[in-house]
Swiss-Prot record:
Family as reported in the entry's similarity comment: Belongs to the phosphopentomutase family.
Cellular component aspect of the GO annotation: cytosol
Keyword Nucleus in record: no
Chain's role: Isomerase that catalyzes the conversion of deoxy-ribose 1-phosphate (dRib-1-P) and ribose 1-phosphate (Rib-1-P) to deoxy-ribose 5-phosphate (dRib-5-P) and ribose 5-phosphate (Rib-5-P), respectively.
CDD domains, alphabetized: PPM
Protein name as catalogued: Phosphopentomutase
Pfam families: Metalloenzyme
Disulfide bonds: none
Record-level Gene Ontology MF annotations: magnesium ion binding; manganese ion binding; phosphopentomutase activity
Cofactor note: Binds 2 manganese ions.
Subcellular location field: Cytoplasm
Cofactor(s) named in the record: Mn(2+)
């Protein structure tokens, strides 16, 4: 029985990419920065001491990161029995965003430029916002700027509740985000507004519209909920997920995977929010999955809760929790199963600003008869998609080189 389990540690980069200078990200290193802070006692909130990731280390994480940066992350060494194949990958895609990373990993790099709203204030064209408001029957909106998702709730959340005006904001990514209160504005109203925005944004080539639902009564207790929804454009060509589905296989999305691929190539969607629930759902789906199945989970909290918020201790604690549960996955893998762990970009919590960082990502592979040892530097995330295609004997992808022969 052949199955692939993909665990996407959203934003878990392992050192600046070859082209990081073009993005202002030379020196960024999500894993290394977290390990360094832990080793220096600067991440002892909710946890303490050096970063402890014994199971990821067994899969080759520390060695993959060393091959990427040239040095071991503080607290890590080669004093571990590695059971998996490990490497690191550069990105071909032009952006350091979520869709680009995910699509490239599935064999379809984004080689064109996304549209962006680059102005930090008055970010959106009036023509665009006027059309959105007219179609939605709204008399105004708030925001119109680059912002942190939590900071803008503190700043504008009360005014939004008082006026009923949605909050529009963006970031360095190709994204249009809409924040609305679940109760005072209504969740379905938010989703419908996002659908309108998605349609009106087509000429601007924006990658995603994101519904940012929140609850609370004031700045002190406003909190985003698990009812986030991403409205992405479709990948420009067929991903390995599409090819798997077309061949009669199952592709099970856990978390926000289906949204990122605009539901293309997905046969089943499982909703879960938070690291614990996402891991639980992954285990359940792996146990239930039959032959010719892909179970694909995005662990978004690493990015949204800790990377963007520049919370080093929180990121470290989340990594240690994730690591502690990996044996549960190991225990239920079949002899022919392929386990893949990777990331879609970096988001160094020690870095300036709140945006993603252009980094290499880990490529950790276990099972399916793979020999333990180095896979070296991969020239594209697409090597993962090509390897999945090879594993399932699907039609080869246009991009990528398989590490499964």
């Amino acid at each position: 029985m052949k199955r692939t389990i993909i665990m996407m540690l959203d934003s878990f980069g392992v050192g600046a990419a070859t082209d990081a200078e073009s993005f202002g990200d030379v020196g960024s290193d999500t894993f290394g920065s977290i390990a360094k802070a832990c080793a220096e006692g600067r991440a002892d909130i909710g946890r303490e001491g050096p970063l402890k990731l014994p199971n990821l280390s067994k899969l080759g994480l520390a060695l993959a990161a060393k091959e990427s940066t040239g040095t071991f992350a503080p607290g890590f060494s080669d004093d571990v029995e590695v059971i998996g194949a490990y490497g690191h990958a550069d990105e071909l895609s032009t952006g350091k965003d979520t869709p680009s990373g995910h699509w490239e990993m599935a064999g379809v790099p984004v080689l064109y430029e996304w549209g962006y709203f680059s102005d930090l204030t008055n970010s959106f064209p009036k023509e665009l916002t006027d059309k959105i408001l007219a179609r939605a029957g709204l008399d105004g909106y708030l925001g119109n700027c680059h912002a942190s998702g939590t900071a803008i709730l503190e700043e504008l959340g009360e005014e939004h509740m008082r006026t009923g005006k949605p909050i529009f904001y963006t970031s360095a990514d190709s994204v249009f985000q809409i924040a609305c209160h679940e109760e005072s504005f209504g969740l379905e109203n938010l989703y419908n507004l996002c659908i309108i925005a998605r349609e009106e944004l087509e000429p601007y080539n924006i990658g995603r519209v994101i519904a940012r639902a929140f609850v609370g009564t004031g700045p002190s207790d406003f909190a985003r909920t698990g009812n986030r929804r991403d409205y992405a454009v479709e990948p420009p060509s067929k991903t390995v997920l599409d090819k798997m589905k077309a061949a009669g296989g199952e592709v099970i999305s856990v978390g926000k995977i289906a949204d990122i691929y605009a539901n293309c190539g997905i046969t089943q969607k499982v909703k879960a929010t938070g690291l614990e629930a996402l891991f639980d759902a992954t285990l359940e789906q792996v146990k239930a999955a039959g032959d010719k199945s892909i179970v694909f989970t995005n662990f978004v909290d690493f990015d949204s809760h800790y990377g963007h918020r520049r919370d080093i201790a929180g990121y470290a604690k989340a990594l240690e929790y994730f690591d502690s549960r990996l044996p549960e996955i190991f225990e239920i893998l079949g002899e022919d199963d392929l386990l893949l762990l990777t990331a879609d970009h970096g988001c160094d919590p020690s870095w300036k600003g709140t945006d993603h960082t252009r980094e290499r990502v880990p490529v950790l592979a276990y099972g399916a008869g793979l020999k333990a040892g180095s896979l070296g530097r991969r020239n594209s995330f697409a090597d993962i998609g090509q390897s999945i295609a090879s594993y399932f004997k699907l039609e080869p992808m246009e991009y990528g080189e398989s590490f499964i022969k």
